[in-house]
Amino acid sequence: CVSFYFLSIKQLGATDELYIKMNSRGKPLTEFEHFKAEWEGNIKEIEPKLTEEQKNNGEKTLSQTIGHKIDVAWTDLLWPYRNSGTGTAADDIIDDEFVKYFRFLADIIYCKNSIPLNSSNDIFTITKELFGSNNPHAIENVKTIERGFDCWLNIDIESLFGSVLTTHTTDKPRKCIVDEPVNIFVEACHNNGDIISGHRRKFPLGRTVLLYAFVYYLQHKDTIEEAQFARRIRMVSNLIKGSEYELRENNLANLIRQTEYVLDNGDIEEGYLSFNANQLIEEHEKVEWLKNNPEKDDVLCKLENHNLLQGAVRVVGLENIDLTDRFYSLFECDWALVNRALLTIGDYSQLVSWRYQIGSANNESSWKSIFKTNKEDLKETKRILIELLSRSNKFTDEVLNNIIDD
């Protein structure tokens, strides 16, 4: 398949500019350079014209500003992350990284404008739709892209993510446990828009929402304090982990809206569908509970971080938060013994889909599906679990065998 790119000389401006863009290099333009020229051309068509006074004061047009940022500030931003591991010459330039992050921001624009996400890999189609003269929001869309890049400038990106996220349990329980890599910005620059195994995103929708939370925070640091963000990003992370079936492209606009509300207010906005309803209720209950129990924030975070709970603590209950260490020690034991010990107390099974589920000896997903059931249906399971946790300060296989034998 042979592709041809059409560049309007009129849009590109003077012939000397065209010469610089094409001939001085002695080689054809890359796809990224075509995209850049196309985008700048779109901006020139829609940008406000400068007055003579503005020109005399040295002010730049919007297209000039964006073009300069692409060439300098935004290139410097992406340069440390230019190697996406393709093993090609593309690893020495930031073209792919720029386009992938640009597409992330474009997806946000689609959602905010209530437009279905463009599933096309054609960046030129996306550029025309969002920044063409026929789009009444084109100027604001350009500003959204500009803010989306600018917010990362002069930021220690690794430290930002590392201050609130981790991939494993640490002695700082307030950090959210997430999948690798912790630096979601870099992951987006390398993987966003790529599809694997049919329609599965290489950069999952949950990571899209989590990255947007950081972008939103960086753009609103004047109203969201650092400590507030640390608590609120945990809420967002919990909601993402508890919303497997709600993380859909046609629901992304609602997920973004709820994320913004959480970051702005530290609570849940009710009245519309977004994340999983059970997890939304639980996160609101935690907010109210922490108002009266602020000293227990660390232990709550520790319980949320347990791999079998992943933010959903309703099977233990906020009123039983002091049993957190016992819960950890219980599930450090042989899970087959944990299952048998629970069954000696009662039937703790849950109806999951079409069958009744109990915990497996070696499959963590069975436990997770039980523990994430809605609060009402969990009552008996919770009663049995708390009864077991009350029988020992610390659990071992020997302790569980004694409980089973008794």
List PLM regions with ranges.
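Flexible coil/loop and intrinsically disordered segments
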Residues: 1-406
